[in-house]
């Protein structure tokens, strides 16, 4: 079925194909497994790009047909939309639409598409019989024929009848509209003629005087330009191959610049008057800037923007990397001088055009003056200072920049965010077509992407498309560096061969250079795919970096095309609920099956013509690059995933909010830049709960389930069992977060496994196993609490006597910021001391044997022999790593973070706030009549027991269990109650060090399933 859909899609014009893509998006968003004619009809009715169906429905309105003017004609279309919506709601849906497979085309929709194709072909055959000189060409189905065929479907006709419309009448109106002139779009022809549709009048009716068809040009403009038809469908506007026809050349398009003007005037946000234009491609964003400049030059703007000058202040990544601090400051001074010269005369305004803002977020710190100096960050600060200064003076100075979606996401993730620092307001420009992607079924294949550009005539052959795809920059960072080096050598060698007066100039020289550089790109593309097995491209390498290598004309003609084309990948953004990408064309090269078998065959183009093609959607995938899918995952999708990860971390570990952005940034860098698929993090500090919650949040956010997490506590686990668990996880699990607590207590065998994995990157790579593993190592953990996995007993003590607290030994007031991890039961402390002595002796033996294994010629004489000497000192783990081998391994982990709790105020507030809010929700805010307190030891139990369940589960426990206890208090009568204290249940039990065991806690956690209520007089 999907292969048939792909074949049918090749026979559609871009406008009809766009409707089909939107229908696929609608079905996917609603969770439907198939795309039906109802989806297509609903899309046709609500589509903003084509109002053909809506206009025909308005003409078919019974009030309009009888000659009476309806008060609101669009209400009938609104009723029809509701009818289609009800019909779509009746279709069976997937309970989890985000993780379902891609929708396929239903039999009814395939039949409708084939009917449209047959009607279109029948009309063309009739035309060609009357015009014998025209050869038979492949015909593409137009939107009119698609609408007529959809209306013939019984399900659509039934919905039309329910809304009071006749599908026959609507079809008649569509045929009448298309009979004015309806050119047929042919798939491949250098000379395109004009043909009418099957429903058009005969040629004799249109042209009584001759045998050639000469339609009225005014009708063509009315029927096609006002209906947003693409120029590539209209043969009257046929342009040579490769030429781009902009809409401004045919009729003025001013709507795109209106949002920018509103931002500049402060209509949307008075505090943010600077603009960043966000779009899929450079041509879209630069086109909006050009429209704005044209309108200001013509004076077609409000008075506040008239007499406004433009100043270009644009940079590139490569140029900034070689600029010193003095250069940046000089450029800013020159910019300020120009601004002052314009604004000092009659209150004129200035718009500073910053161009593409990728230099602000992708620029590195490789400066010529200092290794710690970043020219990009310095320039960002200077521009921010400039914005602040002019905003205080009231001068008319605006910033105008452009950005792709991935660049804008990075702008928001900077600290501080660039839109806040520069007072930027984003203006999103929709792309010319939706992004539906067709991937070949081969697991090693990446699909070719064809952008649906509405004003560009595409008549390239299949071979030309393959060459263009092969000419793109899709190699890794290492090969990109080698390509840039070779390209620089080629350019410099050309200039050194001949003297300047003998060197060739003009277009021929540029064409030759472009051909040579294109050959270099193809060479390094094939070499990278063969040698590096399609490693993910380094995001630090971008097409703009080649501006230092290529002349300006070559940069505009080749690399900018590549950068535009590479931006059309599947994305999910905040403003777009679901965007998919369709891709056409031949299949690309398959990667080598084995990386260790490198031969000359790897450099040959290996095209498989017979590979079955299907529609695939990259939803719910891991953010890590995989060989089985397109390794160049689009940046916006990664940025959104990382943004959601940061939100989840802030939700679960708010007391470590200062460290969380660095963790998310490290995860993102590990995903994008690391050559290995594993991510490694080393977390130190005494906050055990935060470390465990970090692991569980990473697991659920990136891999979707708690089952993809492995916890190994080297303090409590046996060495052999820990090694076996780690080996099994590396062999069997493809996606897993491995939490290794107290890695400083690891023995030699366990450490060898970690070191081998760290050095190899993929331990099972030679077996063809594709795994995505996050290693989270912890050390310097605080001492574990005894019985931490048992259910916490709780009781609500309601004191009616007004005497205050129940037990003076506790510190129950949550306002007093109870001290955590400070108290210890004397009996437990005694047992710990005895066990520590025995543990020390055994650990000394392990340390001694381990040193003999790793450093046979060196012996550490500083080992503790008498454990009793350190009784007065602070307790330390007895088997911390002292060997340089293990220390060097831990030091080699770049992502190192510290989770240390210095103050328990934030932790106390985190738990008490949720409990207090729940109490006020049930009992009401009666603080003047009674007080609510939480035992400090209970908060400590909460803190140490909530490591392996998320914040959402704790909130669920508060609503289901804790509030049930409050209802008991409420029903028992809260009159006369002075203090309600939530504390540990059974005071004598706690003081004697006994264990309160319950069969099972709330959903398998340490939280109880019930809370006892006690009324104390």
Swiss-Prot record:
SUPFAM superfamilies reported in the protein's UniProt record: Double Clp-N motif, P-loop containing nucleoside triphosphate hydrolases
Single GO cellular component term: nucleus
Region of interest called Repeat 1, as start-end residue ranges on this chain: 12-91
Subcellular compartments: Nucleus
EC number: 3.6.3.-
Coiled coil ranges: none
Keywords: Hydrolase, Nucleus, Repeat, Transcription, Transcription regulation
Annotated region described as Disordered, given as residue ranges: 196-217
Region called Repeat 2, residue ranges: 105-183
Upregulation: Up-regulated by salt and abscisic acid treatment.
Clp R domain location: 8-183
Disruption phenotype: Reduced drought tolerance and hypersensitivity to salt stress, resulting in poor growth in normal soil.
Classification via InterPro entries: Clp_N_dom_sf, Clp_R_dom, P-loop_NTPase, SL_signaling_regulator
Expression sites (tissue/organ): Detected in seedlings and roots. Expressed specifically in vascular tissues. Expressed in flowers, stems, siliques, leaves and roots, with the highest expression in open flowers and the lowest in leaves.
Main location: nucleus
Motif, EAR: chain positions: 859-863
Superkingdom to which the source organism belongs: Eukaryota
A GO biological-process term: cellular response to water deprivation
Sequence similarity: Belongs to the ClpA/ClpB family.
Protein name as catalogued: Protein SMAX1-LIKE 4
